[in-house]
Amino acid sequence: MKNKITVILKKNLANLGSIGTVVKVSSGYAFNYLIPRDFAQLATQGSLKHHKMFLDMKQQKLDEIQDKLQASAQKFNKISKISVKKKVGNNNQIFGSVNDKEIISKLFSITGEKLEKKNIYLPNIKALGIYNLNIIFTSDIQVSMKLQILPFFA
């Protein structure tokens, strides 16, 4: 019969698990490899309690972030279409292109919510028209709206 002990992983290990995972390993593996190389710590009653408290705090922070993202998405869901004016040349071609900064500032002026460039997904826009604009907060929190490019005459 092999002696198995419980350890808490401090680093991601392909064959055991990710950081914070509680695993049972043979005592030789733990004391000769994992613990001396600071890959794991011995799972005592105190360290398990501390680990559980840490996981609870981490989950609470994730829930708060999820709630904030959900509230932001609700604000953006109220917007069905935004319009941007651009200077136009021949054949309804716009000068330059519509970039993320313009969209972010336009949405900020409407909602008061700041977005990052990585949240905005829009096609390459070189002409007047209506395009789909996607705002992706997380894989399950997404907002779609229309982006209308109008001519601007100076």
Swiss-Prot record:
GO terms for cellular component: chloroplast; ribonucleoprotein complex; ribosome. Pfam families: Ribosomal_L9_C, Ribosomal_L9_N. GO terms for biological process: translation. It comes from the Eukaryota. One of its GO terms (molecular function) is structural constituent of ribosome. The keyword Cell division does not apply. It is found in: Plastid, Chloroplast. Keywords: Chloroplast, Plastid, Ribonucleoprotein, Ribosomal protein, RNA-binding, rRNA-binding. PANTHER family: 50S RIBOSOMAL PROTEIN L9 (PTHR21368). NCBIfam families: L9. Binds to the 23S rRNA. HAMAP family: Ribosomal_bL9. Belongs to the bacterial ribosomal protein bL9 family. This is Large ribosomal subunit protein bL9c. It comes from Gracilaria tenuistipitata var. liui. The gene is rpl9.
